[in-house]
Amino acid sequence: MAKGEGKVVAQNKKARHDYTIVDTLEAGMVLTGTEIKSVRAARINLKDGFAQVKNGEVWLSNVHIAPYEEGNIWNQEPERRRKLLLHKKQIQKLEQETKGTGMTLVPLKVYIKDGYAKLLLGLAKGKHDYDKRESIKRREQNRDIARVMKAVNQR
């Protein structure tokens, strides 16, 4: 858990497998009352989510927030687009970095900080299959080395 983070509600583990994360930043989320109740109950799925910069605003798409059971008529559509709250300079920087460079914005983590839902947004570049295999191979080698070092240190 990074410095200053609150209770982690959801993580997107697949994003770190499919993308190389270049930079991360924290964004607020504009949610309705029933949506925040569902988020606090950890009923959120970030798996297919992505963010886009449109007209000077950042929008989060394909993130599923399950309808709140007791929300009845106030429930929103589960996969509606949601606005992300960032400073103007951050939005301009993201727009420059994602425009025509093969970079994308992926949600990495949702957590509650000081009573507000925050999203850890990653600036990412897609991995090819051979990059994924290389990452897996490197991780297994590190585990083997750690296992050997642990065995040596226990003697």
UniProtKB/Swiss-Prot annotation:
Instruction: Extract the PROSITE patterns matched here.
Output: SSRP (PS01317)
Task: Give the principal location in a single coarse category.
Answer: cytoplasm
Q: Identify one Gene Ontology CC term for this UniProt entry.
A: cytosol
Asked if the Swiss-Prot or TrEMBL record annotates the protein with the keyword RNA-binding, the reply is yes
HAMAP family noted in UniProt: SmpB (MF_00023)
PANTHER family named in the record: SSRA-BINDING PROTEIN, TMRNA-BINDING COMPONENT OF TRANS-TRANSLATION TAGGING COMPLEX
Where does this one sit in the cell? Cytoplasm
Q: State whether keyword Ligase applies.
A: no
Q: Which InterPro entries match?
A: SmpB, SsrA-bd_prot, SsrA-bd_prot_CS
Name it.
SsrA-binding protein
Q: Which GO terms describe its biological process?
A: trans-translation
Similarity remark:
Belongs to the SmpB family.
For this UniProt entry, the molecular function terms from Gene Ontology, in alphabetical order, are: RNA binding
Instruction: List the NCBIfam families hit by this protein, alphabetically.
Output: PRK05422.1 (NF003843), smpB (TIGR00086)
Gene3D superfamilies in the record: 2.40.280.10
Taxonomy of the source species:
Bacteria, Bacillati, Bacillota, Bacilli, Lactobacillales
Q: Which purpose does this protein serve, as stated in its record?
A: Required for rescue of stalled ribosomes mediated by trans-translation. Binds to transfer-messenger RNA (tmRNA), required for stable association of tmRNA with ribosomes. tmRNA and SmpB together mimic tRNA shape, replacing the anticodon stem-loop with SmpB. tmRNA is encoded by the ssrA gene; the 2 termini fold to resemble tRNA(Ala) and it encodes a 'tag peptide', a short internal open reading frame. During trans-translation Ala-aminoacylated tmRNA acts like a tRNA, entering the A-site of stalled ribosomes, displacing the stalled mRNA.
Q: Which UniProt keywords apply?
A: Cytoplasm, RNA-binding
Tell me which species this is from: Streptococcus pneumoniae serotype 2 (strain D39 / NCTC 7466)
